[in-house]
């Protein structure tokens, strides 16, 4: 086999998504999902795409999806910088929490970032935001 990096070709974007965004690949809507590219989960975008509030280095991520025990729940939130390096992560136990809400204090990074919300049934959802 061939070792190396994966090349992801660019795809059609909403007017709000910059061409150099990590969301600007054909992977959006197939490997991971966004509000603009929900792929096969088009009816699920409203409850699965992470909602992000960012103010002065404080980031709050909410996934408006109910936690239904281990049957259907949000597994985790992960924050990435513009280079897709992890800058924060929260795992959820659906038997302990009723809502997928995570908070992060990010002091050493500013710029474009991504919030991932992973559902145990409906895959990974990504939202771009600015810290």
Per-region residue spans from a language model:
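Contiguous segments within soluble domain cores/interaction surfaces
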Residues: 41-42, 55-92, 96
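Exposed aromatic-hydrophobic patches
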Residues: 60-64, 99-108
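N-terminal export signals
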Residues: 1-16
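Generic detection of short hydrophobic beta-strand segments and adjacent strand-loop junctions
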Residues: 90-92, 104, 127-131
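Short, surface-exposed ligand- or partner-binding patches at beta-edge/loop junctions that are enriched
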Residues: 110-120
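Short acidic/polar inter-strand loop motif in beta-rich domains
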Residues: 118-128
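Transition segment at domain starts
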Residues: 14-58, 91
């Amino acid at each position: 086999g061939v070792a190396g990096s994966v090349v992801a070709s660019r795809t059609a974007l909403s007017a709000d998504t910059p061409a150099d965004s990590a969301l600007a690949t054909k992977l959006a809507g197939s490997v991971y999902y966004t509000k603009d590219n929900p792929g096969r989960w088009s009816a699920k975008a409203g409850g699965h795409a992470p909602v992000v509030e960012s103010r002065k280095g404080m980031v709050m991520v909410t996934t408006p999806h109910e936690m239904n025990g281990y049957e259907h729940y949000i597994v985790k939130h992960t924050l990435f910088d513009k280079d897709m390096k992890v800058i924060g992560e929260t795992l959820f136990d659906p038997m302990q929490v009723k809502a997928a809400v995570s908070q992060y204090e990010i002091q050493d990074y500013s710029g474009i970032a991504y919030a991932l919300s992973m559902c145990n049934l409906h895959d990974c959802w990504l939202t771009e935001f600015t810290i």
